[in-house]
């Protein structure tokens, strides 16, 4: 019986459960005990977290020129938009860096006193036609900064309680992109496309509920500004025990984008460049360039609510791409489509080339379809599909040439065998 009594009175660590006989030291607190091993483990965890913060602080933050140069490698044209994005992103992460490293953002007063101020974040609105490079710009930014990146579509969002996706689902995508590392997610980038589709249906507030327009704008306000949001993991296997994941959006950069069809007319009416009445000249508004002319009142008239506009202080406009721009997109960027398909053909030991006229025809076709740069891959796939189907089964093919007729579907891409090339080489030698 004595042994039983002794075991009952034996003190144990409240954290690991080891008894005082199994550890070197047991420190007592108010109704709790902690052993030396648990203290050592706690110190290791704290040191590891401090090291991570220090390393993050010491990592060089890309300057606007470096961000711009990176975008130049991947995105053709849109110079003003690239400059605006580079500056906005640099200021955003400089603001975060100052907060993480414990720097005080202060403003010196007239009498030498310092008043601490809070620097608000600058979310970004991209305005540009379909296929002008809005999504690709955001993706390239995230790649340069090495931060989690999530893409969402505003058209699928509705107010909480209605059929559709809640705005919290956007945050869940970012958390998933960060592999459920909430600290990384809280410094990530969220890109929301088709933001113009959630404009309210009329300029005047309606008595009927607009659950996919103004209602979504209202729901987005808090996460755009910065709040601690509760996100349901929806069966996330890495956190099955948690009902909600809590993420602070204060340092999440939001880039929202849309085509804003019809905004050109609003800008023209404001600037007095659009005639009114039956005698006014008819002009295709799709050809009007509004770069650098968009003002908050234009967005308000389009259907965005004032509070939503106020949370998007940086507005960058993208121009419609020309045929020359499209040809450059096909050939110049690091991951240009022509380079990608040449690499695919090289893997089969075949050289792929394009006539200059063929490249122009592809660019014109993409513009005619109204799909912009994102339609280029579909056109190339359609042109090269017959060749790519037959190529793996043929060992005699040395080269493939895409001509203007091949783009127009008047002929297939020209195929040159090793024998044909050798015969041509001998003919040139004899000549």
Swiss-Prot record:
Domain ClpX-type ZB: 1-54
Origin: domain of life: Bacteria
Protein residues bound to ATP: 129-136
Keywords, alphabetical: ATP-binding, Chaperone, Metal-binding, Nucleotide-binding, Zinc
Pfam (any one): ClpB_D2-small
GO BP field: cell division; proteolysis involved in protein catabolic process
Residues that, per the record, bind Zn(2+): 13, 16, 35, 38
Keyword match Magnesium: no
SUPFAM superfamilies cross-referenced by the UniProt entry: Glucocorticoid receptor-like (DNA-binding domain) (SSF57716), P-loop containing nucleoside triphosphate hydrolases (SSF52540)
Molecular function GO terms recorded: ATP binding; ATP hydrolysis activity; ATP-dependent protein folding chaperone; protein dimerization activity; unfolded protein binding; zinc ion binding
Entry coiled-coil feature ranges: none
Listed GO CC annotations: HslUV protease complex
Function: ATP-dependent specificity component of the Clp protease. It directs the protease to specific substrates. Can perform chaperone functions in the absence of ClpP.
Record family assignment: Belongs to the ClpX chaperone family.
Subunit structure: Component of the ClpX-ClpP complex. Forms a hexameric ring that, in the presence of ATP, binds to fourteen ClpP subunits assembled into a disk-like structure with a central cavity, resembling the structure of eukaryotic proteasomes.
Protein name: ATP-dependent Clp protease ATP-binding subunit ClpX
């Amino acid at each position: 019986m004595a042994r039983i009594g002794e075991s009952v009175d034996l003190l144990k660590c409240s954290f690991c459960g080891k008894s005082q006989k199994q550890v070197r030291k047991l420190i007592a607190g108010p109704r709790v005990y902690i052993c030396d091993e648990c203290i050592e483990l706690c110190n290791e965890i704290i040191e590891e977290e401090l090291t991570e913060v220090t390393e993050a602080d010491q990592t060089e933050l890309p300057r606007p020129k470096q961000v711009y140069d990176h975008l130049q490698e991947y995105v053709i044209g849109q110079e003003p938009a690239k400059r605006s994005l580079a500056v906005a992103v640099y200021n955003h992460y400089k603001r975060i860096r100052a907060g993480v490293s414990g720097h005080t953002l202060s403003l010196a007063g007239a009498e030498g006193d310092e008043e601490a101020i809070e620097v608000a974040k600058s979310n970004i609105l991209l305005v540009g036609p379909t296929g002008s490079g809005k999504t690709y710009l955001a993706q390239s930014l995230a790649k340069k900064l090495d931060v989690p990146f999530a893409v969402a579509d505003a058209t699928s969002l509705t107010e909480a309680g209605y059929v559709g996706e809640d705005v919290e689902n956007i945050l869940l995508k970012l958390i998933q992109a960060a592999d459920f590392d909430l600290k990384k997610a809280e410094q990530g980038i969220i890109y929301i496309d088709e933001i113009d589709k959630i404009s309210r249906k009329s300029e005047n507030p309606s008595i009927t509920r607009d659950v996919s327009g103004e209602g979504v704008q209202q729901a987005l306000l808090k996460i755009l500004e910065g709040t601690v949001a509760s996100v349901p993991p929806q069966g996330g296997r890495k956190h099955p025990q948690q009902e909600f994941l809590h993420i602070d959006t204060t340092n999440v950069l939001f880039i929202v984008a849309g085509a804003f069809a019809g905004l050109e007319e609003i800008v023209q009416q404001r600037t007095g460049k659009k005639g009114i009445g039956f005698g006014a000249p008819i002009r295709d508004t799709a050809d009007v360039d509004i770069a650098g002319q968009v003002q908050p009142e234009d967005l308000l008239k389009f259907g965005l609510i004032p509070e939503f506009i106020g949370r998007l202080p940086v507005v960058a406009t993208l121009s419609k791409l020309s045929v020359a721009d499209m040809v450059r997109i096909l050939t110049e960027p690091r991951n240009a489509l022509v380079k990608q398909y040449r690499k695919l053909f090289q893997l089969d030991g075949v050289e792929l080339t394009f006539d200059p006229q063929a490249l122009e025809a592809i660019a014109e076709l993409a513009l005619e379809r109204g799909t912009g740069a994102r339609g280029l891959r579909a056109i190339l796939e359609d042109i090269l599909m017959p060749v790519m189907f037959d190529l793996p089964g043929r060992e005699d093919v040395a080269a493939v040439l895409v001509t203007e007729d091949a783009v127009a579907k008047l002929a297939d891409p020209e195929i040159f065998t090793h024998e044909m090339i050798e015969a041509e080489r001998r003919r040139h030698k004899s000549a």
